[in-house]
């Protein structure tokens, strides 16, 4: 089990609502894991943390994300290309090779309104439904099989 919390870039919810776009000038956190809404400077909410978690889980399994090797003449152009890659990458393709619940988790996160309080119990149960499936990289045996 991994618990990773970074409150260094957290923003408070004001009266239960996400912050406004004018409250910040750039993407919060690493662009590689940031939600599409974060990169578009839209109001952030819990769903953005969950979308970032989904990208982190895919990265932990694969060791890279489809946009990990994106390059461009400027950082701004690179960030735009990464955002576009995320917007066009279907959860089923991004999560290919992972248990089906990962793609569904990402789909639900992306569809959630920014201000909505997630049903954490349901999301946890969704991911737990596939917890018994070993995560394997193509062509590699799991440590327990050696």
What are these regions (language model features)?
Residues 19, 26, 30, 36-99:
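Conserved C-lobe activation region of Hanks-type protein kinase-like domains
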Residues 54, 58-61, 106, 110, ...:
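Short, amphipathic alpha-helical segments that act as regulatory/interfacial helices
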């Amino acid at each position: 089990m991994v618990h990773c919390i970074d409150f260094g870039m957290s923003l408070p919810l004001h009266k239960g609502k996400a912050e406004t776009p004018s409250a910040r000038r750039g993407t919060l956190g690493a662009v590689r894991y940031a939600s599409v809404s974060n990169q578009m400077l839209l109001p952030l909410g819990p769903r953005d943390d969950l979308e970032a978690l989904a990208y982190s889980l895919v990265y932990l399994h694969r060791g890279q994300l489809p946009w990990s090797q994106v390059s461009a003449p400027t950082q701004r152009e690179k960030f735009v290309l990464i955002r576009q890659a995320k917007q066009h990458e279907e959860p089923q393709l991004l999560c290919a090779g992972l248990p089906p619940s990962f793609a569904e988790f990402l789909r639900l996160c992306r569809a959630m309104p920014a201000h909505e309080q997630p049903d954490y119990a349901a999301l946890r149960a969704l991911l737990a439904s596939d917890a018994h499936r070993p995560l394997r990289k193509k062509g590699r045996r799991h440590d327990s099989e050696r």
